[in-house]
């Protein structure tokens, strides 16, 4: 009985276990894919990077937690493996590789292709040899008589993987199984192999010597034994190379003849020279960068402008609706480094020509309310063109709280027309304003990125620097005049008649008000693609009704955008909050958008040949016109909130949680701008729902121009181009036609942007010394998906709510900076501890901790948040506020000079105290100071650290405060306000005092250097003098950058070495480097004094202008002509060359 019960229980248990196993196998749920993967799979395509399997990952990354930790720590220090890296215990044999190479060699050795390749390489070496100094003097020519490739190939005995293997920082999660191994493919692979060769490769050369002599040389490679390094890498661009780790053992068989007679005496000389060549070119650290045969796509691409287009019947191959989806960008070169973290965005443009970066500016209109005043507060200057064309008038200064200042006219604005009359001279401006009534309509041009904050807090930006696209551009043409005034003059030929029409309509449509009204103006007469549409927005957005609610950044000043895009006077004259995107000019194009009530919504494509009229913003329409560019951004920031009115600073973007699909705010059907994404770990990824747009391509379109941008962290509203690429639409169309689903996905290498002057490419310095380096490959790549939509096919895929919520959550996690802080352009969101560096400042600087002035201009500055403090305040600052608020600090730094409401002086009566206070802070410094400060922040320029300058037991001699001169450029004491027994004074002032003692320099040296520098080039005209001084300052800045890099490398070597003798050598080298840095600093002060001398003269002239404007404000209108003549006689720029600049005029 018991046996039966046991059998029954076993049967029941077996049945239960069988059913349970079947249930688990058949009904278990599959793991859910990630939100972005599911969305792309639902849309018909998936983009996943190749990843190694677990066995390969164990081989690459070690397979153990301890070894992995060691690899990760070493990977952070250096991306290039060194020969001292730890090796796995076992070595690999490569019999399969040797057999494969031998088989391929046997099949290819005697082919014409292989022999042509070998002879071509040999001839290249001959050409390089003839170009050398020594050989070039003796050799007339080299010719190859015979070459034999040998009967075998190099034999690889053993090979090992060099550790550490650096994983790609793509942000992808690790394996969910819990293995502590990177899931991504390596960024760099390096192998070391023991190689032996005795194949008998030889070649015979005929040599033509000078004086008609000839010689014969036979060289045979008998034996080679050595250790070879083979590297595959993606940094900074994809390439490979091989080189010997150390000097190999090489045996040569050499025979030489001179005029038919043997010359055995030359054998040893030739062998030694061949070994030196191998050591110099093919032994680490020297190598040749190679692309073929693994990466042939890295070759440069050209554009053929005259090629014929492909047509199918009467339609061009490219015509249709093209959906473009941005996937990711990687390896971007940002501010001289590949490891920066910042926000990037992309612009796409359809054009008939390749991408070209040009000056961006906006044409604006303002209504100037003159009232009963006889002066509007403007000082003008006529800038003559160097190419023979008529000059143009620019605004030199704007009096505070004057009618011009209330109308938001700024220094550097170019006046185009007044009251419908084109401006050609300053006298014409004076006459037109005098003849006008209480109100006058002014057309002016302003560079992109220049805002009202620049006029209040950054008056040092002159009109010369505003012609540059960013603070790092070096444009010599901008020093004399606007380089594009020929094109601008042609744009305004028909302006006069159009302005009068606009004035009449404006009076009917706009209510009467005492506030100045501003209306953006769009001019479109240039051919398609004449100007690059970098972040362009149409200034006319009346075609589409604006959103109903736009939250304001300042709660007490709600902003209501009208269709005519006018702003009230309070918003014009008061400093507004910074914009999320800077206003930029419209894209001149052939087809002009018209109001939706018009039957002809688009003009003929050939319209560029006809001058277009100035367009007026139409009244609000019932329905928006159908756009040709549609954004399929679900959950994207509502771009319609980014209206391009002249005063959009008070407007925020709508919340990104909007669930309905929105359309891009740009009215340009050929332009689209993506949302910003965080770029870190050498990669930036777009979400599918935030990076798709649809273009309607027509026959006139030939290229899709793509550009990547980031914000300039040192200039409000500034943008820096990181790279661009122009794609032929025919190639895209052919790629889509290759598959039936009409999709095409590929990666494009970015072309370099316009060269920047002061960006030192530190990350590329070592690599650029190698043969085969091309800096055009160093600007990263972008991966894009294309799809031609069929007729009737929807332009976007409806994502389920669950997947959308997951994706929005994923986007929030990777998200970038708060929207209020985007304009600051900080490099990282995370709060870091202060990282202070000793910095030499050029501008008057105040301590952010004790709020007192840094008299020596040498203080400590945080690398992340630009926090400045005295060296004596550094310890207190770290104790109280160890974390740096990068966002708050930069906002405060940017806005600290803005005046608050109610603090402006009365009209025409600026107090003397305010002028004197602003003179010390907001001195007109021109381009030089801004470039120097920017370069200093980027490269963290600092003096020699205390630890390298001081030795134990050195006595410090404190100078008496009475010997400290009253100057801002000398090396005075930072601690004059403290007592002589102050511990902060004794401890933290040691660096400067010790440098002064060791270098043998005191205050008199700095004073003498500065005083002598004030007389530099004084006999030259002002512009020529500025150019010479700035050239020398740029040259010195580059020298300081290089010396600092050399100094830092010596410090690292000194810390790493344990050899006492080597340490002493490095200490001596550090001392010499410190002396050189000190000498370069003195030279910088020397030449900087010349610039300050020019600024002092200009400030004195501006003071005279202010006095005269106050005087003229009380005079009558009948005396205006005589006052103008007096002002011309006493204008402060009479020493400037008359062929470039005319006299300044005050209005």
Swiss-Prot record:
Task: Tell me which residues bear Phosphoserine.
Answer: 490, 515, 532, 960, 973
Regarding the membrane, this protein is recorded as:
Single-pass membrane protein
Name the Gene Ontology biological process terms.
Answer: cytoskeleton organization; lipid transport; mitochondrial calcium ion homeostasis; mitochondrion-endoplasmic reticulum membrane tethering; regulation of cell morphogenesis
Q: Where in the cell is it found?
A: Endoplasmic reticulum membrane
Give a GO molecular function annotation for the protein.
lipid binding
Where do the SMP-LTD domain residues begin and end?
87-293
Residue spans crossing the bilayer: 2-24
Q: Effect of knocking it out?
A: Null animals show poor overall growth and reduced total brain volume, although the relative volume of certain regions is increased. Mutant mice demonstrate impaired hippocampal-dependent spatial memory, increased spontaneous repetitive stereotypic motor movements and decreased anxiety-like behavior compared to controls.
Q: Ranges of Pro residues compositional bias?
A: 580-596
| SMART domains in the record | C1, PDZ
What Pfam families does this protein's entry cite?
C1_1, PDZ_6
On subunit structure and binding partners, the annotation says: Interacts with MSN.
Per the record, what about its domains?
The SMP-LTD domain is a barrel-like domain that binds phospholipids.
- State the name under which the record lists this protein: PDZ domain-containing protein 8
Organism lineage string: Eukaryota, Metazoa, Chordata, Craniata, Vertebrata
Q: Which gene encodes it?
A: Pdzd8
């Amino acid at each position: 009985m018991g046996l039966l019960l046991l059998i029954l229980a076993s049967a029941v248990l077996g049945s239960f276990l069988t059913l349970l196993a079947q249930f688990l196998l058949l009904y278990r749920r599959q793991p859910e894919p990630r939100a972005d993967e599911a969305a792309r799979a639902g849309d018909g395509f998936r983009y996943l990077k190749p990843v190694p399997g677990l066995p390969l990952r164990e081989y690459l990354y070690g397979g153990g937690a301890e070894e992995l930790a060691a690899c990760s720590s070493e990977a952070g220090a250096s991306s290039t493996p060194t020969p001292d890296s730890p090796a796995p215990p076992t070595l690999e044999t490569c019999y399969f590789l040797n057999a494969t190479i031998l088989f391929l060699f046997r099949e290819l050795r005697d082919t014409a292709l292989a022999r042509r390749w070998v002879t071509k390489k040999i001839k290249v070496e001959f050409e390089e040899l003839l170009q050398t100094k020594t050989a070039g003097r003796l050799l007339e020519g080299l010719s190859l008589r015979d070459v034999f490739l040998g009967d075998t190939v190099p034999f690889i005995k053993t090979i090992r993987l060099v550790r550490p293997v650096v994983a790609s920082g793509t942000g992808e999660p690790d394996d969910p199984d819990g293995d502590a191994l990177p899931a991504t493919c390596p960024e760099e692979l390096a192998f070391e192999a023991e190689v032996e060769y005795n194949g008998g490769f030889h070649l015979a050369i005929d040599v033509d010597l000078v004086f008609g002599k000839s010689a014969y040389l036979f060289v045979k490679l008998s034996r080679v034994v050595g250790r070879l390094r083979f590297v595959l890498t993606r940094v900074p661009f994809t390439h490979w190379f091989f080189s010997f780790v150390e000097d190999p053992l090489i045996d040569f068989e050499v025979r030489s003849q001179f005029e038919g007679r043997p010359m055995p005496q030359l054998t040893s000389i030739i062998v030694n020279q061949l070994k030196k060549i191998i050591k110099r070119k093919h032994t680490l650290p020297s190598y040749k960068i190679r692309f073929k045969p693994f990466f042939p796509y890295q070759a440069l691409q050209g554009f053929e402008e005259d090629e014929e287009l492909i047509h199918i019947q009467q339609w061009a191959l490219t015509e249709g609706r093209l959906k473009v989806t941005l996937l990711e960008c990687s390896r971007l070169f940002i501010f001289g480094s590949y490891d920066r973290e910042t926000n990037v965005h992309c612009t796409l443009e359809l054009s008939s020509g390749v991408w070209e970066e040009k000056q961006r500016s906006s044409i604006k209109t303002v209504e100037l309310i003159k009232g009963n005043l006889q002066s509007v507060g403007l000082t003008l200057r006529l800038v003559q063109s160097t190419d023979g064309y008529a000059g143009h008038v620019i605004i030199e200064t704007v009096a505070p709280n004057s009618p011009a200042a209330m109308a938001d006219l700024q220094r550097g604005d170019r006046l185009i027309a007044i009251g419908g009359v084109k401006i050609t001279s300053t006298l014409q401006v004076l006459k037109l304003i005098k003849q006008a009534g209480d109100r006058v309509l002014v057309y002016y041009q302003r560079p992109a990125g220049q805002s009202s904050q620049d006029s209040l807090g950054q008056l040092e930006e002159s009109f010369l620097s505003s012609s540059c696209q960013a603070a790092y551009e070096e444009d010599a043409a901008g020093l004399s005049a606007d380089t594009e005034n020929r094109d601008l003059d042609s744009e305004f030929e028909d302006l006069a008649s159009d302005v009068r029409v606009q004035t009449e309509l404006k009076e009917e449509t706009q209510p009467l008000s005492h506030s100045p009204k501003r209306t953006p103006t769009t001019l479109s007469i240039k051919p398609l693609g004449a100007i690059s549409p970098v972040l362009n927005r149409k200034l006319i957005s009346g075609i589409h009704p604006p959103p109903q609610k736009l939250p304001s950044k300042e709660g007490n000043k709600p902003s209501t955008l009208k269709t005519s895009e006018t702003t009230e006077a309070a918003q014009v004259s008061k400093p507004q909050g910074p914009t999320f995107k800077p206003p930029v000019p419209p894209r001149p194009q052939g087809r002009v958008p018209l109001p939706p009530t018009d039957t002809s919504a688009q003009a003929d494509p050939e319209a560029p040949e006809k001058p277009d009229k100035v367009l007026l913003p139409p009244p609000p329409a019932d329905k928006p016109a159908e756009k040709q560019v549609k954004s399929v951004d679900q959950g994207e920031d509502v771009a319609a909130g980014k209206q391009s009115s002249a005063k959009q600073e008070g407007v925020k973007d709508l919340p990104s949680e909007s669930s309905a699909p929105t359309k891009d705010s740009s009215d340009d059907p050929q332009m689209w701008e993506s949302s910003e994404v965080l770029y870190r770990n050498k990669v930036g990824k777009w979400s599918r729902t935030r990076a798709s747009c649809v273009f309607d391509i027509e026959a006139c379109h030939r290229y899709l121009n793509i550009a990547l941008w980031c914000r300039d962290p040192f200039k409000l509203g500034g943008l820096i181009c990181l790279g661009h690429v122009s794609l032929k639409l025919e190639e895209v169309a052919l790629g889509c036609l290759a598959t039936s689903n009409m999709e095409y996905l590929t990666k494009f290498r970015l072309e370099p942007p316009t060269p920047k002057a002061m960006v030192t490419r530190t990350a590329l310095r070592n690599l650029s010394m190698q043969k085969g380096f091309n800096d055009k490959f160093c600007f990263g790549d972008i991966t894009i998906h294309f799809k031609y939509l069929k007729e009737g096919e929807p332009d976007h895929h409806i994502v389920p709510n669950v997947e959308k919520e997951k994706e929005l959550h994923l986007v929030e996690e990777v998200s970038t900076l708060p929207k209020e802080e985007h304009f600051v352009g900080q490099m990282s969101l995370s709060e870091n501890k202060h990282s202070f560096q000793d910095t030499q400042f050029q501008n008057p600087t105040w301590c952010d901790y004790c709020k007192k002035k840094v008299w020596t201009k040498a203080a400590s500055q945080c690398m992340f948040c630009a926090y400045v403090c005295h060296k004596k305040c550094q310890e207190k600052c770290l104790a109280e506020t160890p974390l740096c608020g990068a966002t708050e600090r930069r906002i405060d730094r940017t806005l600290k000079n803005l005046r608050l409401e109610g603090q402006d002086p009365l009209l025409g009566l600026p107090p003397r105290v305010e002028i004197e206070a602003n003179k010390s802070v907001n001195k007109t410094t021109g381009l030089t100071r801004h470039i120097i400060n920017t370069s200093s922040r980027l490269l963290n320029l600092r003096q020699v650290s205390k630890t390298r300058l001081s030795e134990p037991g050195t006595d410090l001699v404190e100078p008496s405060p009475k010997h400290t001169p009253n100057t801002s450029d000398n090396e005075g004491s930072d601690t004059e306000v403290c007592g002589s027994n102050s511990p902060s004074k004794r401890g933290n002032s040691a660096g400067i005092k010790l440098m002064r003692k060791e270098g043998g320099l005191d205050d008199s040296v700095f004073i003498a250097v500065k005083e002598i520098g004030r007389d530099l080039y004084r006999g030259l005209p002002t512009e020529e003098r500025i150019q010479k001084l700035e050239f020398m300052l740029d040259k010195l800045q580059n020298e300081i950058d290089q010396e600092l890099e050399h100094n830092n490398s010596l410090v690292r070597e000194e810390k790493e070495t344990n050899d006492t003798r080597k340490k002493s050598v490095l200490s001596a080298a550090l001392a010499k480097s410190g002396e050189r840095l000190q000498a370069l600093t003195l030279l910088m002060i020397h030449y900087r004094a010349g610039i300050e001398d020019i600024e002092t003269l200009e400030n004195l002239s501006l003071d005279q202008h202010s006095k005269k404007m106050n005087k003229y404000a009380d005079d009558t209108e009948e005396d205006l002509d005589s006052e103008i003549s007096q002002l011309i006689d006493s204008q402060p720029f009479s020493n400037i060359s008359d062929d470039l600049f005319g006299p300044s005029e005050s209005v």
